[in-house]
Each structure stands twice: as structure tokens, then as C-alpha cells.
């Protein structure tokens, strides 16, 4: 019987493979000659440790196998690597635009691994075309960025192994950062900001009640004083609304006291206009503020009040 699928254009076949699990896409290489290397032209890979184990028939994922899967895909644009334990991995791609790293464990003697000068452990990112980097449950002290990235958006979620962390790789061209800040890792806020000296926009979601003494004891990040323009702060709803609001305004105070030019947005879930006005009054008691616009409202209903400040720091209110 004639193989009608194999007669389809390469572009259409690549689209079909893109919508298959990566493990299934790679298996098509055993089909007739035309399929042998076709999977390498698929612009997306989703690598999960358990699937890799089945595919390569190894007890543990091989560093070499992972690196080969990535480097032998010449048009790869989207890559997600999940639930992987390796000694060393280098993500090298000239075409990669989006990289997601979830639940990494770097194995080594006594499970105490850091990326040294010999480059034998940890993760190295060499992706000059990268535009988006997402890090979740990942030991940040174990990776470095080799190539110069021209423009990138970064999302950090639930990262662990902070106790040994002193600084992140520097992202000189990072302009927008979306970050989750948990009570137990309050000291990470200035570390996030210090790693991005030219940051212009921050989307910050608070989980729990940040410890301001840990934040305030760190040096003021350069980006707050030179480049920050927009800050959005959202507090995950908690039972103790008064304590939640206090935490949110304290974080806002830290940013406002150190920023030179700022537009601030606070999302207050399930609050009334009177509550928004009360929060504004607290903000106005902050010293040395230099913001030009404040938006306060409820995200769910898209209710927002805007406050615009003039040079004399008088403000006018309007609905947005």
C-alpha cells in the first residue's frame, strides 16, 4: 500500500511531529529513509527524565545523551527539560528561543555540587538567541550563562538550594522579570534584582509574609537606582488580610524608597475602594518616594484606581 503520509511536504510532517511527545517523535527515525533525520528539524523538544530512561534504556539519564539530543536539532526553538538528575549538562543551541528548566538535581560526591572552573558539574547555557528563560525548582548556584543574550524575559518559580547561593549569573540585557517571593526566601528579592542591572519592569507575586529585615539588610540593587520604571506587586490571598496588606506595603516601601522613577501597581484582591484609599494613605507616608503613578485595584474584577503625581507630589485620582 502506498505511503501517503510520507509524500506530504517536510513542513507539514515537522508540524505533525511537533504535536507528538518527543519520545514518539524520535521513534519515527526507524521509518523509511525520509523520516530518519526528520525529527531533528522539529522546532520543539519536551524532555522528561522518565521518558528518556525508556528511550535510551539507561538506569539514569546520560549527560551525553541529553546534550546530543539538544545539539543535533539544528532548528530547535523551544526546549523544556523536566525531572532530570545529571552531573553536567550544556544546553548549546544557536536557534533556541525558549528554555524551561524544572526540577533539576545535580549529582555528585555527597550531593554537594557547585559549578567550578573545570566545568565538570552543573549546567551551562550557551544560547545566544534565547528570548525566554523559565526556572522552577532549580539550584541556581549550579548554572552559568556563557553566551551573550541580547534580549531575554525570565521567570523564576520555587527555586531551591538558597543556603549556598551568593549571587546569580548576571543578565545584563534582562529588562523584565516575573518572580515569586516566598516568606522563607525573602533574601532572594535583592539577589534577583542585583543580577539584572538594567531591569526596567518587575512583576512580583508575594507568597506568605516577606521578612523585610532580610531584604533591607542587603545592598540596594543597581537597577532600582538607575533603570526600574514599572513595578507590579500582587499578594496571594491570605486569611489574615491585615497582615497581608502590611507585607505588601512594606515591600512597596522598600522599592519606592530606592527607585528613581517608577510606575507602581498593587493588586488588592477582594478589596473595596475605601481599602484602596487606605493603602494609598500608607504609601504616601513613605519617605523619599519618587513614583509618578500608582494603580491600586482588584485583579479579578479589573477594578482599578489611578493616582498620578506631579512634581510637587500632589496627586489626582481617576478610574482606569
Swiss-Prot record:
In terms of CDD domains, this protein maps to:
F-box_AtFBL13-like
Q: What InterPro entries would the database entry show?
A: F-box-like_dom_sf, F-box_AtFBL13-like, F-box_dom, FBD, FBL13/AtMIF1-like
Q: What is this protein called?
A: Putative FBD-associated F-box protein At3g60710
SMART domains tied to this protein: FBD
Instruction: Name its species.
Output: Arabidopsis thaliana (Mouse-ear cress)
Sequence ranges assigned to domain FBD in this UniProt record: 212-268
Q: Which is a Pfam family this sequence falls into? A: FBD
Looking at the record, the residues that make up the F-box domain are: 2-48
Q: What is the lineage of its organism?
A: Eukaryota, Viridiplantae, Streptophyta, Embryophyta, Tracheophyta
Amino acid at each position: 500500500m502506498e505511503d501517503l503520509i510520507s509524500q506530504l511536504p517536510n513542513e507539514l510532517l515537522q508540524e505533525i511531529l511537533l504535536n507528538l511527545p518527543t519520545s514518539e517523535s524520535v521513534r519515527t527515525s526507524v521509518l523509511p529513509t525520509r523520516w530518519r533525520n526528520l525529527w531533528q528539524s522539529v522546532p520543539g523538544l519536551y524532555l522528561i527524565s522518565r521518558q528518556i530512561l525508556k528511550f535510551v534504556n539507561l538506569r539514569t539519564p546520560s549527560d551525553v545523551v541529553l546534550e546530543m539530543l539538544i545539539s543535533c536539532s539544528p532548528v530547535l526553538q523551544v526546549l523544556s527539560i523536566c525531572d532530570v538528575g545529571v552531573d553536567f549538562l550544556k544546553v548549546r543551541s544557536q536557534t533556541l528561543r525558549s528554555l524551561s528548566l524544572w526540577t533539576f538535581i545535580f549529582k555528585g560526591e555527597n550531593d554537594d555540587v557547585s559549578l567550578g572552573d573545570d566545568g565538570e558539574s552543573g549546567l551551562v547555557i550557551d544560547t545566544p538567541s534565547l528570548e525566554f528563560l523559565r526556572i522552577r525548582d532549580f539550584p541556581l548556584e549550579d548554572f552559568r550563562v556563557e553566551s551573550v543574550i541580547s534580549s531575554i524575559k525570565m521567570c523564576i518559580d520555587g527555586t531551591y538550594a538558597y543556603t549556598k547561593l551568593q549571587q546569580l549569573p548576571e543578565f545584563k540585557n534582562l529588562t523584565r522579570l516575573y518572580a515569586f517571593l516566598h516568606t522563607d526566601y525573602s533574601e532572594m528579592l535583592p539577589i534577583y534584582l542585583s543580577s539584572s542591572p538594567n531591569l526596567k519592569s518587575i512583576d512580583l507575586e508575594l507568597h506568605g509574609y516577606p521578612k523585610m529585615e532580610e531584604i533591607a539588610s542587603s545592598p540596594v540593587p543597581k537597577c532600582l537606582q538607575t533603570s526600574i520604571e514599572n513595578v507590579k506587586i500582587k499578594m496571594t490571598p491570605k486569611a489574615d488580610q491585615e497582615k497581608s496588606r502590611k507585607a505588601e506595603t512594606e515591600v512597596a516601601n522598600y522599592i519606592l524608597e530606592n527607585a528613581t522613577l517608577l510606575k507602581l501597581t498593587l493588586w488588592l484582591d477582594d478589596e473595596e475602594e475605601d481599602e484602596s484609599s487606605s493603602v494609598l494613605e500608607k504609601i504616601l507616608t513613605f519617605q523619599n518616594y519618587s513614583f509618578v503613578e500608582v494603580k491600586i485595584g482588584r485583579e479579578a474584577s479589573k477594578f482599578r484606581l489611578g493616582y498620578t503625581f506631579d512634581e510637587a507630589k500632589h496627586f489626582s485620582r481617576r478610574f482606569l
